[in-house]
Amino acid sequence: IVSAGTEVCLVVGGGNIWRGREAENLGTEKTTGDYRGRMATIRNARCLQSFFENHGLVTRVRTSIPVAQCGEPYIRRRALRHLEKKRVVIFAGGIGSPFFTTDTCAALRAKERNCDGIFMGKNGVEGVYDDDPRKNKNAKLIKKITYSELLADNLKVRDNTAVGLLVDSSVDVRVFNRN
């Protein structure tokens, strides 16, 4: 894809391992759990960077929280310059604030860059469904849906903040099973 001239940037997830019930069971408050999740995304970004560079791609990790030895600080114009130079840019640390998901970060970075699309890897689902297919075997795959319909129907393939950011955009989202 990169050799064909496509600018590629990735938003890395991985924070869910520290949030939700697991964090609560450890007595961790939500804010602390979210920051631990941000650090997990930085770790995952470094793993991806190594993998890509071992396969001949030039990459840069940009972090939204300061971790100088692990990645460059996120500065929009510098990230754009890396893309112009045909480098793969890997965004880590979410948007740098608690209570916002990696989905929101992907939507924000896509809008900042005027991206054509987002490929969103989800755990165990092949797309958007009318109900959770892991809980309802009769859930139906929805082939095409607008952001406004996602919000109105309260479908939870991604969080509503991320969907809200994209309502007035032309960014196309494709959901795929990352497993």
Range-by-range predicted roles:
Residues 4-7, 55-59, 84-88, 113-117, ...:
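Short coil/turn connectors at secondary-structure junctions
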